[in-house]
Amino acid sequence: MVTPLTGTHEGVSCDGCAFTAFAGNRYKCLRCSDYDLCFSCFTTKNYGDQQTIADIPIHDESHPMQLILSSVDFDLVYQGDPTRHYDERKIVSFTCPYCNITGLTERQFGTHVLSQHPEAPGYSVICPLCIGNTEMEHIQSKETENLSVHWTEIHLHTMENLFRSTEPITTRPVQRRPMLARRGNRAGVSRTAAQGRPLQDEIGAEMAALLRNMGPDSVEDIRRFTEMMTVPLLPGIRSSQRLMTSTGDRPTVVVESAVTHQDPNVQQVIRPLATIPIYPPTSDESGDETPQPAADSADESEDDNDIQELDDMQPIVEDEALKKDEFWKTLKTRISEEDVDLILETMKSTAKVKEDIDDKMPVWTQRPLKRLANAAQVTTTSDSEGDPGWLPLSFETTPIRSTGCGGYWSDKRFLRPRKMQREQSVASSNAEIMEKAEIALALIRASCLHEPVFTDPTKPDIALKEALQHLRLGEKPAKMMEYQAAEELVNMPERDPITTGEMEVEIPDFTARGYGQIVDGNIPLGVVPEADEAITNSEDEEIVGGETSGDDEDEQEDDENDSQDSSVPEEINID
């Protein structure tokens, strides 16, 4: 005998791929008589070769399909549910063969069919409950023309029995009624045992057997308890009198039975409970409540006492030392009188032992003002070495650990953007540093005697120090140069390049005076000062004398040329 494979649909073949005993999900058509598809053919819409046969419709994509799980998948899905058994019912979620609604339970399916499809639409369908039931799976006639009638005749009674058997048994919770005072015998309440003896006789026999097996002390306690329980039934005996007298001088409350046919001589005795006073007893008989006028007078007397105490208090006065304090005088001029009284009250209530003023370090001491000299001669000292700071402060803040968020630093979603942002900032800062380095190297090459050679990249300052050694950058001048204001510039006549035939060229002044002006920033680089103080008076006189003699000769030559020019038009005759 061949053992069927676990998790396969035995005896079923796929009409799409013709594979027998396939595994996985099985899809059963609820319109066609015998049409099944595997999971692969259902998802790819492989419906196989269908031949047109009389009275047999061809399968269409719109036909409702019922999902049937394999045994392995069923156990995995409904594991731990004692009401689901694959051997009894292999379908849990049903599909309507009319409107193709899925996800219906047995009860929901029946309600849906009876309410939505009471009349047959005119074609036969397959009942999904018959397919899911193992006992009805191999029945030949599974098709029905009226599903509502089929449900009422076949499945309704079976489903009711199934629901009744699977529903959990609900029991009412036991409610303990409070024990009330026992009353007398009621009519028709006396119970008898199976042998015909009263129930009290059985209890008495059991009680007697219990008394024989117990000690003398316990016997006495049980006997007293028995007498107490039988007091309502025997009101005239001696035990009831003893019990009532033990309660003191309290009056006995006797309540007659409400039953009309009961013996009128039988009375019910109720033992009053002992009361414990909440408040201690008082000698007077005024009662618990206080009259309203008395209460009002008491409140008024308390208010009067408070006012009297306030009047008796001595007024707040200032001490002699406080009156002479300059800070207190200034403070009084800036705040109101109420604030002054409040401060005095606070100072009076929080008085402390007077301490020596000399032993305490002042909070604020004014630093003596120093006259500022040149910027190079001003020296600063730290507060720890020299005089104390002008305003030392002490801040009390919350620790950073208490306000931090630990989850933020452990979450990778936040750390990754921070890392990327940090890398971008580092890259941008490196680029800026390289640009500045190139500019610095260009300046160094222009000002150094020879180009520095950086043999060790980690120590570039050594090469720079050797290259810039002639500039003496680290040495301070023995005497500071005094600042001199720039002199007014004299406008010199401009030379016309058209008349002179020369291009105007700006020649920088490389003299000591010009270099100083360029460094100080008074004159832009490359601009020649139009008036230079380096020209001495003697040179000016020589230049002036030479210019005067030369000017006379030039004037004579110009006069001769003018006379010649004037004689030219007389000699030329124009006919």
Curated annotation (Swiss-Prot):
Binding site for Zn(2+) 1: 14, 17, 38, 41
Encoding gene, per UniProt annotation: kcmf-1
UniProt: Zn(2+) 2 binding residues: 29, 32, 59, 63
InterPro entries, alphabetized: Di19_Zn-bd, KCMF1/Dystrophin, Znf_ZZ, Znf_ZZ_sf
Enzyme Commission code(s) on record: 2.3.2.27
Disulphide bridges: none
Main subcellular location: cytoplasm
Ranges of compositional bias, category Acidic residues: 297-306, 530-563
Name used for this protein in its record: E3 ubiquitin-protein ligase kcmf-1
Catalytic activity line of the entry: S-ubiquitinyl-[E2 ubiquitin-conjugating enzyme]-L-cysteine + [acceptor protein]-L-lysine = [E2 ubiquitin-conjugating enzyme]-L-cysteine + N(6)-ubiquitinyl-[acceptor protein]-L-lysine
Membership in a protein family: Belongs to the KCMF1 family.
Annotated keywords: Cytoplasm, DNA-binding, Endosome, Lysosome, Metal-binding, Transferase, Zinc, Zinc-finger
GO molecular function: DNA binding; zinc ion binding
The protein's role, per its UniProt record: E3 ubiquitin-protein ligase which accepts ubiquitin from an E2 ubiquitin-conjugating enzyme and then transfers it to targeted substrates, promoting their degradation by the proteasome.
Pathway entry: Protein modification; protein ubiquitination
BP GO terms, sorted: regulation of cell communication; regulation of signaling; synaptic signaling
Pfam families: zf-Di19 (PF05605), ZZ (PF00569)
CC annotations in GO: nucleus; plasma membrane; synapse
Zinc finger extent (ZZ-type): 9-73
Region feature Disordered, mapped onto this chain: 277-306, 530-575
Localization of this protein: Cytoplasm; Late endosome; Lysosome
